[in-house]
Amino acid sequence: MTLDEALRYIHEVCWKGTIPGLERIQALLDAMGNPERKCKFVHVTGTNGKGSTCAMVASILRKAGYKTGLYTSPYLIRFNERIQINGEHISDADICELTEYVKPFAESIFERPTEFEMVTAIGFEYFARHKCDIVVCEVGMGGEFDATNVIPAPEAAVICNIGLDHTEVLGDTLEKIAGAKAGIIKPGCDAVLYRERPSVEAVFEERCKALNAPLHKADFDSLHLLSHSLEGQVFDWERFHALRLPLLGEHQLHNAAVALTTARVLQKRGWKI
């Protein structure tokens, strides 16, 4: 199978893009021997800032010496960007081999997987084969019924900024959308929250209380911008000083606070960061 053939197969119209629900992806992964159970995860949802936050968390883990997978969507230039280990994109050869591997399983289950489910299965198999210590995994859409939510309880469930998006599927208010995204919080994990208005935060507080999952709200008040230029920003946050961020905008400082809060949570869970 060539790269063009692999991508054509993945992107076929019959894969139907993205359809909420876990039945197809769970059946596919079960047939594959459940590669999603062979890695630890940081699961990231939200409307805005997911990609930046995922990249920051993955960078922190990588610098700490962990073999770190990163699963994101969509891509900017090449499909390979969506699946990475330690900052290196999946190779064309691996895409071909893994697509050929997953294809018979995908065609054997009760209903063909969607495109996103197919890519998710390829990503999980790739991370499992390479024995990643931890994978930073970005939700495709929503949370509770997103294909990525088949993973076991993550080390941290991270909720980025909530906005009105995919309202036809997730709901027409911020609170309803928050409810869908809160579905990635599971018993046994810690939750990290981008600060929101009280009615939205209450949705996550209720979910965490029901599941006995600790909730950690990122501290935006401790952010202090020291300087900025075309090369990025330098800032203080809590006890950390002169941190450099190669991204511009106040919203990126907020995303950085979420990433740093996540790192602190992982540290408390035994990760050496």
Segments (PLM) and residue ranges:
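Hydrophobic alpha-helical scaffolding
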Residues: 18, 194, 249-252, 265
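Thr-Gly-centered strand-to-loop micro-motif
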Residues: 85, 193-195, 246-247
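A short glycine/serine-rich beta->alpha loop
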Residues: 107-112, 244-250
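A generic structural signal for residues located within well-ordered alpha-helices
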Residues: 20, 52, 116-119, 180, ...
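Acidic, Mg2+-coordinating active-site environments of NTP-dependent enzymes
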Residues: 39, 110-111, 118, 131-138, ...
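Short glycine/threonine-rich catalytic loop with a Thr-x-Gly-x-Asp
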Residues: 68, 247-260
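ATP-dependent carboxylate-amine ligase catalytic core
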Residues: 18, 22, 26-37, 63-152, ...
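N-terminal leader/targeting and accessory segments in enzymes
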Residues: 1-48, 52-67, 76-77, 93, ...
